[in-house]
A protein has these predicted regions:
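Conserved glycine(s) of the Walker
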Residues: 11
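Hydrophobic positions on the alpha1 helix immediately C-terminal to the Walker A/P-loop
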Residues: 15
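Conserved substrate/cofactor phosphate-moiety recognition/catalytic segment
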Residues: 19-120, 131
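Short, surface-exposed connector motifs at secondary-structure boundaries
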Residues: 115-122, 141-146
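Short hydrophobic/aromatic beta-strand immediately N-terminal to the Walker A/P-loop
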Residues: 2-3
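The conserved Walker
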Residues: 7-8
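Conserved GTP-binding G-domain of TRAFAC-class P-loop NTPases and closely related GTPase folds
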Residues: 156-215
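Conserved phosphate-donor/acceptor-positioning beta-strand/loop module used by diverse small-molecule
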Residues: 128, 141-161
Length: 215
């Protein structure tokens, strides 16, 4: 079970493609190595488009339309929360839930089925909540998984620049807060994962170092 961490605009998709063979443009949920990709952003962007919302307009919506922003991002369940299959079968996505909340529920169901089959997973997230990662790591290990983390690092300035070119543009203040939270967790993650922790400097897009790929 591999945890990806790095703030918005850090280039996690590029790194996952380089290391694990995941093409972010593909609709499939697996890598060329057979690892299943768990990423609520894919479902989120799909649901945004189904609701007639251009992901590139999120930053503008956050500033200009508080009601719509709430419908998009109101409190959502945590994707990594361990859920048993029996519970998942009874779960239904309520019509009143936010788009982000619905995306996370879809992804949580997907993740639980992968876990039931003990399939290898790449859990793609920002890592801005240390307690969430620690909890999910412990749970994955209780299921028999070995756990690893790839931390994709970049400067705030580069992250902000890339954010403007992403399909889903985040508000500047949210991006900066997330970036700072992730940076504050860097040392904690190193201690948590020990020898199974790798940092990828992605300030400039370039081939991933061989020692990271071999790890």
């Amino acid at each position: 079970c591999i945890f990806m961490a790095g703030g918005p605009g850090s280039g996690k998709s590029f790194t996952a493609m380089e290391i694990f063979g995941i093409d972010k443009k593909l609709k499939s949920s697996f890598s060329s190595y057979g690892l299943k990709s768990v990423n609520s952003d894919s479902a989120f962007e799909t649901l945004l488009k189904k609701n007639g919302i251009d992901p590139k307009h999120l930053a503008r919506i956050e500033k200009e339309d508080a009601e719509l922003w709430s419908k998009i991002t109101a409190d959502a369940p945590t994707v990594g929360t361990p859920l048993k299959i029996g519970i998942l079968k009874r779960m239904q996505i309520a019509k009143g839930k936010s788009i982000r909340g619905r995306a996370k529920e879809i992804t949580a169901k997907q993740k639980a089925f992968y876990e039931a089959g003990r399939l290898g997973m790449i859990i793609d997230g920002t890592g801005h909540r240390y307690d969430k990662i620690a909890k999910n790591k412990k749970y994955a290990e209780s299921l028999g998984y070995d756990t690893y983390m790839v931390f994709v690092n970049t400067s705030l300035e580069v992250a902000q620049e890339r954010n403007q070119n992403r399909e889903r543009v985040l508000p500047d203040d949210l991006l900066e807060k997330s970036w700072k939270d992730v940076q504050n967790n860097l040392g904690k993650f190193q201690n948590l994962f020990g020898g199974n922790f790798r940092i990828v400097d992605n300030t400039v897009y370039k081939p991933i170092a061989k020692q990271v790929q071999k790890a």
